[in-house]
Amino acid sequence: MENLESGAQDALQSKDFLSYSTLLDIYLNDPTKYSNEEKEQLLGHILTILSENKQLTYEIGWDLPQLLILYVDSDYEFNGPIRDSPGVYKILKIFENLAINGNHKELFLKSCELLNDLELSQDEDIELLKRENFFEIKLYCVFELIDACLKKIHTLYPSRFLAMTVSSFNNLMFKLTKQHGSLGNYHFVMKRVYSFCRNYISPPLPTNAKEMPQEELDKIVKDEEYLQRRLLTGFLTQVIYLANINGTEGYSIEHFSWLQQQSKSKIKFVFERDGAFCDRFVELASSFDIDLLKCFQGFITDSHKLLIGIDYKNKNKSEDEIIELLFERVVVDYQKNVLTSIVDSDAKAIKDSIIGELILFTHSIAGKKNFAKPTMSIHDSLVMTLRLIIPQMVNPKFINAGNHDVVVFWVWFALYQQQIINSKNLQLEISYIPKVLLTTFFQCLLFIVIKSEGKPNFKYMLLTLLTKLLTLSPDTGYEFIKDSLNNCPYESVYPSLIGVYKQLLLNEKWDVNSIELEKLNISSSSSNTPPKLPPRNGIKRKHFSLTNESLNDLVDLINNSSKNAFVEDNSKIDPSKLSTIAAYLNLLVAIKKDPVIVENKEKLTTLISSIENKIKSVKKSSQNQFELNAAGMLEITIERFNE
């Protein structure tokens, strides 16, 4: 301690501040060599030295943040206030001293570098909550120092410094998305952004600015005001986009929960968002004159334009060639126009994040439960889905769970608005959509289902939505299911698809426009017209009808599933294929009284006998309890079919 104090006096007398910075580096670069008590003493001593020597703080302060931040981590359990964490209170006071007495430009530059390098610790021996707490303390220290210094830098071109701040913070946010922090951690980070944007004040002009010609100065100030405003809106929307890469607030699942509560059907689950936090960002966007409705409508219009010019009925091109053209066009657009940086690749324009704007607008609409505006057709929701989801199907680096939630919400919104409020014939509307687009739309939704493992309620909601959409185009819907069960590379989705197919074969409908949403009790805020009653003498029909041809398809699918499930000369069962063959057999049990099944009993008897023989082979050869239990389960299902 004496060395630090005497070194400070020597530096002030000799003006050799670099040597003192080196001395501090020697003492501070390894926190592990000190006990908590020693850290407190060391940091307290440095605080005293800096508080008593403003010139020293100005000369050497720029080097301290990167050293001090190392002392935030400790064995503190966070059972009390943060200020009780070893050294943290003194670190906060040192940063406060730097913000007042340091060289603001040098501190700003060094702090931006530090912010850029800041990240959540990956030491799994430390509890995630503790790691996040220490990360938040570090972020608070560094970002508050940046903010304080930025307000005190005299410059004609403040946009340059603001751009550095924005860039460093965005890099931090991007790294955070890869580390999958908790919701609370994201909220803390977002609060820093909100506070910064809302309270931002342009730095002061240099003292010699008055010497410039007034016209020239006015032009610079006006240009800089514009650039700063564009940087702030870009920052706001980009951070919203980044914060939602791993999932949004749950707009679609909340809407589905609301639908269940309005319906006479059994409620599967209840979900309600707390939208207060994101409400602030919507208000902030409005204060920056971001017209979210205009942004949304522009995105939908551009999505339609993107698909214009593709000849979906071109007889000289195969369907695969048309799909290839569609995918190429959408992916190029996504990279060029949707997945944007604040400053574009040519450094010629500052851009807001389109995805961030879509999320903010979705948030502004989702909580209102008013489905009259904006106008949203099924075709609108389709082009939106294709534009945002196709790129994710092509390249995993584009995966964005927030986009999944947003597009699914707007599909539900369109269904409700067009059928319930506008009483549109949805099957007629969907019949005008080219088959290639409709099939790709279904594939996009199936892709979201595949990416929803570990989210049972979200997956259930998605499968319900997919089922409702498939009822609106039975022919295309059936081809989609058959093709998916034959060619989809994700085995895990097969049981769910088979379940959807079963519902479509079993569920009855009164007319082609019924997809159960008409059972809803519509509130007066949505419509004054009650839902139509089914016709008194309506003929009950299934959404999908089983035919001889579709039965042949089903038999082929079950045969293939059987071959994949029973391996090694039918002596073992592949665990990854068990759920699929079980789902197929349960489907047969459910539809066994269908006239087509009854008429083709012999064909099915041959199929079932083949599977029974494989089951017997497994029971005879295997000693594995899982396989024996699986064989027994399949055997029971077959018995139910044979009853």
Swiss-Prot record:
Q: Which GO terms describe its biological process?
A: cellular response to oxidative stress; positive regulation of transcription by RNA polymerase II; symbiont-mediated perturbation of host defenses
Q: Does the keyword DNA damage apply?
A: no
Q: Which PANTHER family match?
A: YAP1-BINDING PROTEIN 1-RELATED
Tell me what gene encodes this: YBP1
Sum up the protein's function in the record's words. Answer: Involved in oxidative stress response and redox homeostasis. Required for hydrogen peroxide-induced oxidation and nuclear localization (activation) of CAP1. Functions probably in concert with GPX3, the actual CAP1 modifying enzyme.
List the molecular function annotations (GO) for this entry.
DNA-binding transcription factor binding
Organism for this UniProt entry: Candida albicans (strain SC5314 / ATCC MYA-2876)
The answer to keyword Ribosomal protein applying to this record is no
- Annotated InterPro entries: YAP-bd/ALF4/Glomulin, YBP1/2
Q: Which family does it belong to?
A: Belongs to the YBP1 family.
Pfam families named among the record's database cross-references: Kinetochor_Ybp2
Q: Where in the cell is it found?
A: Cytoplasm
What's the protein here called?
Answer: CAP1-binding-protein
Query: Oligomeric state and partners?
Result: Interacts with CAP1.
Enumerate the UniProt keywords alphabetically: Cytoplasm, Stress response, Virulence
Gene ablation phenotype (knockout): Leads to decreased virulence in a Galleria mellonella model.
Name a GO CC annotation attached to this entry.
Answer: cytoplasm
